[in-house]
Amino acid sequence: GANIGGISDFSDEFPFVDLMKSARDWIPGNSAGCFDCREPGSNPTCNAPNACPVTINRDANGFVSSLLPNQVVTTIVHAGGTPGRLSAGNYTLRFDGSGTIQLLGASQVSQVAGEIVANISSSTGNNIGFRLTAITGGNPLRNIRILPPGGVCNNDDHRFCDGAAPCGAGATCQLFTAAGVADAQLFHPRFLKNHEPFRLLRFMDWMGTNSSPIVNAADYPSATSAFWTRVPLTTLAALGNRLQSDLWINVPHKATDAFVDAMATVLRDDFTLDRKIYIEYGNENWNGIFSQNVEIPRQFCPGFADLAAGCQNDGVSGNGIACERDPNTFSLGAAQAPCFQALVRAWGDRSVQIFDRFDAIFGASARQRLIRVIAAQAANPDLGRQVMVRNATGQAFTVASKTDTYASAPYFGTDYCTPDNGINPDNNASVYASTEAFLDHLETSGLAVSRGFMQNSKAMLNANFAAEGIRHISYEGGQHLAGIGGFTFNSTCNLRFDEANRSPRMEQIYRTYLSDWKANGDEFTQFYSVGRYSVFGRWGTLEFQDQDVTTAAKYRAITGHTTVNPCHWVGCAQGGALPQLLFTNGFEGN
C-alpha cells in the first residue's frame, strides 16, 4: 500500500483531470502590485497608503463573488520547480460568468466567451496560475475548470493519450476538452496508472489530517468546492472503486459525532462492498510538531477529574486553557505529565467512540468491511501498549478489545544527519565520503535499526495482546533520509540523500527492507507514492507523475515485492480484479 501525497500546488503530481481542484486557494493581493496582503512586510505595495484587503468575498463553493476596492486575487496552479514536471502544451481554462483573467507563467492562445486557451512551455520553471482583476457584478466568474492537454483512451481509463502516445488499434483518444470526458474521468489516467499496484491507499495527507481545524461536515470540501484543499469523501470512495483498493481514512481529531456519522454514511453508500476501510483517529497524535498532540488532551482533560487541575498548570498558566505550550520554550511546564496521561486516555477513548459510530452506521457488515486501527510510535511501542491496554473510560472493556490492527512506522535511515548522537558528516565522515559508502552503511546499519523497530512492535503485541489477535501493520514506512535541525540544509547530507534515493542500489535495499517487514508485519504502506525531493525529505517512490517507472528504484522495489508477495497474511484479499460476472462463457457453456 501507499500514502498519497497531499494536495498542493508545490506537488509534481496532478491527480485530477481538472487542475483547478489541486490549485492553491485564493491569495488576496492589490492592484498596486502586492502579491499577498496577508504578508504586509513582503512588499512595500502591501502597505499604506495602498489599500490591501485580506478578506475575500466568496460564494458557497469558494469562488470569488466580488472584488473589494483595489483588490485582485490569485491562484497558483503549479509552483515553480524543475522545468517540465507540468506537461507542456495547451491548457483550457473554462468558466461561467464574466470578468478579467490575467494569466501567470503562460501565454494566451485564444479566448472566446467562457474559455481561454493558454500555452505552457516545457522550459518554464516559473509559477503557473492566473489572477482575477475584475468581476462583473451579478455575474461573477465561477465554476472555473482547468483542463490539460491530451486525453484518455476509450477502452482503458488508466491510459493517457495524445499525438505522441496514441491509444492503439481499435481505440480512440477522448480529449479531456471533449464534452463530458473530464467529469467522467475525474482522475488523470497517469495518476491511476501509477497507483494500480497498491491494494491499500492511506489518505492522511489527502484529508489534511495533521493540525486539522475541521470540526463539522460543512467545514470539509465537497465535490463542487472550487479547491480540494482536502479531498471530498465521495472522491476518496471513487478512487478506491476505480482501483479496487482498500481505503485508509483518518478522522480529524476535532470532528464532531455528526461529522463522523456523515463520513461513515458516505463511505458505506459510495464505496464498493468487497473492499476494506481502515479507520484511524487523527495521525501521530504523539507527535509534538502537530497541533493534535496538545489539542486532544486540551479538549478531553477537563473530563478526567484526577488530571483536570494538572493540565491547567501548563506553559501559559492562568488563562483557563489546558495543555498550552510556552510560546518561547515550547514547554508544557508542570502539565507535561497530566497532559500526556490525558492524551493516552482520550486517544483510546475517542478511537473507540469513532469505531463504534462507524460500526453502527455499517450495521451487520461492519466486521467484514471495517478495520479498526490504533497507530503509534515505532521507536516506542510501549506508547501503543499504554493506549490499548487500559479500559475505555467508564467501560468494562479495553481499547484493545475494539482494535483490529496496531500500526507503526518502521522507517529506515532515521539516524543520519540528525542531532543528539546521529550519524553525521562531522562525526562519521567516512560514511559520507561517497554515495557507495553511504549506501553500504545504510544497507547494514540503517536496515538493522528499522528491523529492530519492526521486531519490537511485534513483540509488544505478542506479549500483551495475543488473546485479542491484533495484527501488526504499518501506517507509514520506507526510507527517512531527511536532515533534522542544523542538518536540514547541510550540503553533504542533501547530496548523499538525493543520490542514494536515485541510485539503482536503493531497489535491493528496499527489497531487503520489505522482506524484513514481511517477517514482522502484515499490510505495509509506503510514505508516500509520488512527490518531489527537497531538503525536507525524499518521500516519493516517484519524483513526479510522468516519471518513467523503470528509472525509479523505490517504485520498482515495492511493485516487484508486491508481485512476488501479493498477500502474505490471514484474510488478505488482493485488489485489482473486478468482480466476476455471475455467468461467463466458462459456466456450463454459458
Residue map of PLM features:
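Disulfide-braced loops of extracellular cysteine-rich modules
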Residues: 157-168
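Ser/Thr-rich, Pro/Gly/Ala-heavy low-complexity intrinsically disordered linkers and tails
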Residues: 582-590
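Non-catalytic accessory regions flanking glycosidase/transglycosidase catalytic cores in CAZymes
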Residues: 1-156, 172-281, 286-579
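Generic detector of short, well-ordered, non-transmembrane alpha-helical segments enriched
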Residues: 163, 236, 583-584
